[in-house]
Amino acid sequence: MTSKRKPRRRSLSPAKLDEMIEEATVDAYGESEQTVGFFTLLEERLKLPFKTEVLGVEVIVDRLDTTDDQQIVAVCSRGKSQQRVSILNLTLPDPPPEGAEWIEAFRRWARGR
């Protein structure tokens, strides 16, 4: 009996991620404006909603938002409950949603700041 697992999506090359970082941060001065650049691209390109898990519980990522201290968060819901989770810590489903490569690029940028 063979299992029909979908192949895992391969991570993008560092060079491709760097190109995406450049696209998100072009003409942005300072960390705050660069974060806004990423937020804008994530809103445009990340296909929402999608299901994932937070602390082992299935949730739906309904939208993105920013916090007062300029963090990008995913607004996750389960029933009537909502939780905001940093996009840096959000577990992505397998396969990831369309546009998830922008989360990967944002994470690379955030590690390098």
Spell out what each predicted region is.
Residues 3, 24-27, 100-113:
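Long, low-complexity intrinsically disordered regions
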Residues 68-75:
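Short aromatic-glycine-enriched beta-strand elements
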Residues 62, 75-77:
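Beta-strand residues in well-ordered beta-sheet regions across diverse protein folds
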